[in-house]
A protein has these predicted regions:
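N-terminal export signals
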Residues: 5-25
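All-alpha RGS (Regulator of G-protein Signaling) helical domain and cognate RGS-like helical scaffolds
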Residues: 39, 71-74, 87-91, 96-169, ...
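N-terminal targeting pre-sequences for secretion and organelle import
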Residues: 215-240
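An amphipathic alpha-helical core segment
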Residues: 156-157, 161-210, 216-224
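Structured secondary-structure scaffolds
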Residues: 63-81
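Second-shell loop/turn segments in exported
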Residues: 62-66, 103-104, 225
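C-terminal segment of N-terminal export signals and the immediately downstream linker at the start
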Residues: 21-58
Length: 240
């Protein structure tokens, strides 16, 4: 079995990643853009940012964006490839304890890859608003856009340690839900498709905001690309 088939058939060996590789995310908003997580040979890949590294200034500085994308996100992609190679190697030799170790590492690294890839596309350099079907769903599930904003802010600012605030679509209940994810893979819900994510690891904000996570979250909420979120929502609801 080659690497591509191994990934496809294993759906990451049942690890606690948010989505299997071939789910709606990898078929998502732009097949040839940053949403493409895997190449034709089954290797995890990091596509280019959808904008230059000064695009988000002054909201997000160039140095933070460079370090975050190149080393933290990039490191997760390298880690996921290493993890998968080690899983295959130890499966072949029958060392199941090592398979367990590398499967847990893959859950961490691949979930990081998924969330970072969504995060970059969720951001723009101007204020936008949700509209049309997405706005109707927000109002149905949260009462109003303002209430959703307050809820996302609270969830993101209150993550214990490092993690993410996540707005996702739950196809089983046909509703939007908010998750408070620790690390990249803990406290998730099976089936939820992330459509908006906020990274609250310190590497996302410390150079500019120091220890003031709340200020960073408020800044991010001012530059969410709600058109991108709507695209992800419209893709996700097709699973109903």
């Amino acid at each position: 079995m080659d690497r591509k088939d191994f990934i496809k058939n294993s759906t990451i060996l049942g690890s606690a990643t948010i989505l299997p590789v071939n789910n709606v995310f990898s078929r998502g908003v732009n097949e040839n853009g940053i949403d493409k997580l895997v190449d034709n040979n089954g290797n995890f890949i990091q596509k280019s940012l959808p904008y230059n590294k000064t695009f988000l200034e002054p909201h997000m500085d160039e140095e933070t964006l460079h370090l975050h994308y190149e080393f933290h996100h990039g490191g997760a992609v390298k880690g996921a490839n290493k993890d998968l190679d080690n899983i295959k190697k130890h499966l072949k030799s029958g060392e199941m304890e090592m398979v367990d170790l590398w499967t847990r590492k893959l859950a961490y690294h691949f979930s990081s890859h998924v969330l970072h890839s969504i995060f970059w596309t969720n951001l723009t350099n101007k204020k936008t608003q949700p509209k049309a079907d997405l706005l109707k769903q927000i109002e149905k599930d949260f009462g109003s856009f303002d209430k959703l904003q307050a809820y996302i802010a609270k969830v993101s600012k209150s993550v214990e340690g490092s993690g993410w605030g996540i707005l996702g679509y739950q196809p089983y209940s046909q509703s939007l839900t908010l998750l408070q994810c620790e690390n990249h893979q803990k406290l998730t819900q099976w089936g939820v498709i992330p459509i908006l994510v906020i990274d609250v690891w310190e590497h996302a904000y410390y150079l500019k905001h120091k220890n003031k996570r709340g200020d960073f979250v408020d800044t991010v909420l001012d530059i969410i690309d709600w058109d991108n979120v709507a695209d992800r929502y419209n893709t996700a609801i097709k699973l109903r």
